[in-house]
Each structure stands twice: as structure tokens, then as C-alpha cells.
Amino acid sequence: MRGLGAYATVFTPRKDFTFAEGHIIFLFNAILATDITEILVQTGWVARGVLAILLLFSLISWAMIFQKWGMFGRIRRQSAQFLHIFRSTHGVTNPQALASSGSPFANVYAAGYRELQAQVGGIAPNPHPPRLKSLSAVTVSMQLASAEEVRRVEKGMAWLATTGSVAPFIGLFGTVWGIIDAFAGLGSAGAASLRAVAPGIAEALITTAAGLATAIPAVIFYNQFLQNIRDLGQRLDNFAMEVTAQVEKAFN
């Protein structure tokens, strides 16, 4: 791997720069000229521990992201298929739609279907259908099923939220430790040997970058999945109201 200096312009102090500005530019050029692999090899046990923790967070987060992405894709396909079957027939009696399992909408419909069967003893076509004992019981059963479906798809979201909020602070810990190490090296080597400071600064920047690289994808996908869950919950509630209206029309 080539050093960062191969891709960056080395800054040269102007003659009118102050002594402090010249030293800052010297440090910046030293960091750019350092190979990243060399930095990782020379990092202390604290920085390595921080990077290992961030790597673990990142791997679990990406596994969760891919799992959620596939899950929402399946939900969209299964729900579209179920709703097409359900709305292509008239009335509540729709065994074919009930058999279309896998979709959260099918599970909500199945909960209302079971409650309806328990009250009227079956929902086969009848010119004189019995009256429902409690329409609200059918509605509540579907609402409970809807809440359970939302809870099911929410699994794993807490990990993404934790990664997005904690990873930057873990990286910040490595940053603070690297700065402390850099100043310790400056104190032991003397002000004339500023190259002793560059590895500590580079170590601090590496952990900061790792923390941000871990947190940013987790936050982005957490917000996207959270919006998907909210939309799904609203659609399930609307579907429960739609089924309730059909039940009321058919049996009351």
C-alpha cells in the first residue's frame, strides 16, 4: 500500500509563516508521508483494541443491514402479492388470500379471520349470515397482530442505533489516547524531534476515521429502516380498518 503522501501535495512553509505554523505544516507532511500499514503495525495495544472493537461493531452492523434489506424486500413482494389476491375478490371470505402466508398483511388478516370464525362458527357464504357478537374483538385481534408484526421487523434496530451513537465515542477514546501518547513522545524526545509526535497523531486520526466509518453507515440505514417500519405499521393499521369495514358490512 502506498503512503498517503503519494496522493497528497506536500505543503512547504512560506517565509512569512510563524514558527508555530511551520511546525504544524511539518507535522502534517510527516503524517501524509506515513504508510497506513506502517501506522497499523506500530499502533499500541490501546489503539489496536479500539480498532478491533470498531471492526466487530462494523461487521455485525453490516450483517444486520444486509439482513434487514433482504427482509424488507421480501415483505414488499409478499405484501403486494397478498393484497392483489385479497382485493381481487369481494367480501371477507377469501381462503386463498389467507393461505398466502409470509406477509405481515396475511398474518393480520389471519388474526381477524380466526376471531371471526370463533364468533360466527364459520364464514362460508350465507344468505342469512349470523350477527357478530363483538366487532371490536375482531378489530382488536388485528391490531394486536399488527403490533406484533411491527415488533418482529424492529428486531436488530437497537444494534444499529447503538453502533451509530457509540462508535464515534469509541474512536474518540482512541483519538484522546493517541494525543496523550503523542505529547508523551514529545516530552521524552524534546521539542527538536517533532517526528516523535507524528505517529501518535496518525494513530489518533486512524481511530477517529474508523469510528466515523463504523457509525455513518449504521446511522444512514437505521433512519431508512425506521422509515420503512413506520410506513409498514401505518399500512397494517389501514388494512385492519379495511377488513373491519368489510366485516361490518357483511355481518351487521
Question: What does each model-identified segment do?
Answer:
Residues 3, 42-55, 156-165, 169:
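Alpha-helical transmembrane segments of integral membrane proteins
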Residues 4, 16-43, 193:
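Short, strongly hydrophobic alpha-helical membrane anchors
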Residues 43-98:
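Transmembrane alpha-helix/interfacial motif
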Residues 44, 62, 95, 109, ...:
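Residue-level signature of catalytic and energy-coupling elements of molecular machines
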Residues 63-73, 216-228:
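Alpha-helical transmembrane segments of multi-pass membrane proteins
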Residues 76-173, 181-193, 220-252:
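Predominantly long cytosolic amphipathic alpha-helical stalk/bundle segments
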Residues 190-204:
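Hydrophobic alpha-helical transmembrane segments and adjacent short intramembrane/lumenal linkers
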Residues 203-218:
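Hydrophobic alpha-helical transmembrane segments of polytopic membrane proteins
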